[in-house]
Amino acid sequence: MSQPGPKPAASPRPSRGAAARHTQEHVNEKNIGSSSKPGEKKGSDEKKAASLGSSQPSRPHVGEAATATKVTASSAATSKSPSMSTTETKAIPVNKQLEGPDQKRPREQAVKTESKKPQSSEQPVVHEKKSKGGPKEGSEPKNLPKHTSSTGSKHAHKEKALSRSNEQMVSEKPSESKTKFQDVPSAGGESVAGGGTVATALDKVVGKKKEQKPFTPASPVQSTPSKPSDKSGMDAALDDLIDTLGGHEDTNRDDPPYTGPVVLDPMYSTYLEALGIKEGTIPPEYRKLLEKNEGITQPLPDSPKPMGTDQAIDALSSDFTCSSPTGKQSEKEKSTGEIFKAQSAGVTRSSVPPKEKKRKVEEEVINDQALQALSDSLGTRQPDPPSHVSQAEQVKEAKAKEERQEKCGEDEDTVPAEYRLKPAKDKDGKPLLPEPEETSKSLSESELIGELSADFDRSTYQDKPSTPAEKKSNDTSQTPPGETVPRASMCSIRSAPPKLASLKGVVPEDAVETLAGSLGTREADPEHEKTVEDKVKEKAKEEEHEKLGEKEETVPPDYRLEEVKDKDGKPLLPKESQEQLAPLSDDFLLDALSQDFSSPANISSLEFEDAKLSAAISEVVSQTPAPSTHAAAPLPGTEQKDKELDDALDELSDSLGQRPPDPDENKPLDDKVKEKIKPEHSEKLGERDDTIPPEYRHLLDNDGKDKPEKPPTKKTEKPDQDRDPIDALSEDLDSCPSTTETSKNTAKGKSKKTSSSKASKDGEKTKDSSKKTEEVSKPKAKEDARHS
């Protein structure tokens, strides 16, 4: 612990070995602090030093001068390097005070400083090492810090080893070092000066120790292992640098307390009961409903479960009970009934259940008691008789007999009385004899098919389809044996069935008929007569969906026709946009409509007399809807729909306005075709003189005397002017029935096209015929020329 007093100023440039010395001092303090009585050791050391000093008063002054120089050198070193260890500075004044008996003041000062210090916390081993290195310090004062740092590190390692082994050895060494150190005589004046310098150095070192002590950690030094004595200078320097860093500062700082306003949570939870959980929450109106029991679903009655195939068979075959044919089966049943006996029910007990399930345990105990009571009432189980069958005995196949069981209905005895056939009797009660059976004739394929297909809702069998098969059979019979038989006849012969052999025990047909009569008449199934199409129609139902605009309600408001009203709010009557047109004839309308269609030259086009009529016709053409052709006559119900649609279309067409004139509308179709297809002229043989062969030139010299006469051309039949143009246009359309007036117009237009195409075809035919006549005439002329 440091001496109280003013703190000395810290040196600006601490040496490199200061940290090492500081750690060494800290280690020495801890090692010596463990001793039980440090004060007693210190007193004994002082007594020994005093006795040694008194026993050697007569030493030469040379030694005193050497010691003085030593002390001054050491004091100078301490002033230069104030970071020296406190152990060295403290050891020097103690030794100097003990050198001479005349120097009392330094002793008193040293005693005061030692008394103010705590119990000895330094180890005097360092003084021994320093006394040995005294002459070196005197001769070489500049190298003092390095030497002291190296020696300090060595002593630190040695002291660690000694402190671990024994503490007594550590306490004995400072006494020996003091005796060795006090052998040197000291002078009076020099000792006083040395004591003053050492005291000042001691105060400085103590003040520095007081500053550096709280920053040095104690625990890491103790935990470091012992290092080897022969350490390099670099390692020592690194150790010194590491020691200068100091310990870790405490970074755990407490957070500042919160000084803001108090935070409160005003939220709270409340439980709301749902309506109807308790009777008190039910409203009075709903209680009346609950008392009436209205709207409460009652459990459905148990619906009969669907029957399986086995159950259905058992239900149907319940009436067909058979009497036992023999008494053997009853004996077997008795024997088997004696074998089976009542067996005691096995009691199964489970492990002990947990404590929580007490109610279930009581129920299980009750069930076990009931089962035990029932099992006791049944009695004990009798042991089975031992089987004496030996293993060597084996069942032989010869002893195992096969028994045939008669089925119900095979014999007359097994048939129940209700289902037995009663023989037909006469009036007298005698049974009627059965009629002799006719020999079955061989049936053809067609007859067999007709009999088999009688049940499949078809017409009764007819004998007409059997005629070709009979003819084929006749043809095969007429063929001689040497000729080959065709394949068709062979098939007909092979397909004939063989004669049915009369089987014994077969039920006669009369019995089958009587059984069928007992069943009753079959009820007519309404679905049986329906065709397959009707069944499909029942599943797929046709639903009519209203289209947008069919009714006024479905028309959007933006597209509805708004009625024009007067100032008073009355609807205005539609004004006649144009003057009423005179009724037009059919011929006039046909000519006006067929103006754009190319027509043959036979039909003369009518000229319009007035401009008003032409304008009226153009409006009629623009306003009328496009004609639609119908292949068949429509149903009577659709005519009204068509009229309604026509009226709606007329109203829409009126709202569109007048149609702008089309410049290409009045052009004929021939011009359009000619624009696309350009005719090319090809020279034919004989058109020029150069192209005529020399063989035929002499014919030209005869001036056409030998030319054959041209056949008379057919005169084109001109229709009478009085003929109706409608009949002329509709000659080829007699087969197609006309449904409406609009279809007539389109048919007439088409007939014009067909007539024009036919006229052009007729013209081509005439050309071909003329060419053929020319070709025929040419070889005839050649033959005449050869004969001549």
From Swiss-Prot:
Domain notes: Each of the four flexible inhibitory domains can inhibit one calcium-bound calpain molecule by occupying both sides of the active site.
Modified residues (Phosphoserine): S11, S165, S219, S303, S324, S444, S446, S453, S518, S594, S605, S653, S655
InterPro entries cross-referenced by the UniProt entry: Calpastatin (IPR026998), Prot_inh_calpain (IPR001259)
Classification lineage: Eukaryota, Metazoa, Chordata, Craniata, Vertebrata
Region (Disordered) residue spans: 1-262, 289-493, 514-580, 620-788
Positions bearing N6-acetyllysine: K129
Function as written in the Swiss-Prot or TrEMBL entry: Specific inhibition of calpain (calcium-dependent cysteine protease). Plays a key role in postmortem tenderization of meat and have been proposed to be involved in muscle protein degradation in living tissue.
Organism superkingdom: Eukaryota
Tissue spec: Isoform 2 is the major form in all tissues examined. Isoform 1 accounts for 5-10% in tissues such as skeletal muscle, liver and brain, and 30% in myoblasts. Isoforms 4 and 5 are testis-specific. Isoform 6 is highly expressed in heart and skeletal muscle with lower levels in liver, brain and testis. Isoform 7 is expressed at high levels in liver.
Keyword presence, Phosphoprotein: yes
Annotated GO MF terms: cysteine-type endopeptidase inhibitor activity
One GO cellular component term noted in the UniProt record for this chain: membrane
Residue positions, PTM Phosphothreonine: T216, T479
Keywords from the UniProt entry: Acetylation, Isopeptide bond, Phosphoprotein, Protease inhibitor, Repeat, Thiol protease inhibitor, Ubl conjugation
Compositionally biased tracts (Low complexity): 12-21, 65-87, 441-453
Biased composition (Pro residues): 1-11
Protein name according to UniProt: Calpastatin
Cross-link Glycyl lysine isopeptide (Lys-Gly) (interchain with G-Cter in SUMO2), where in sequence: K112
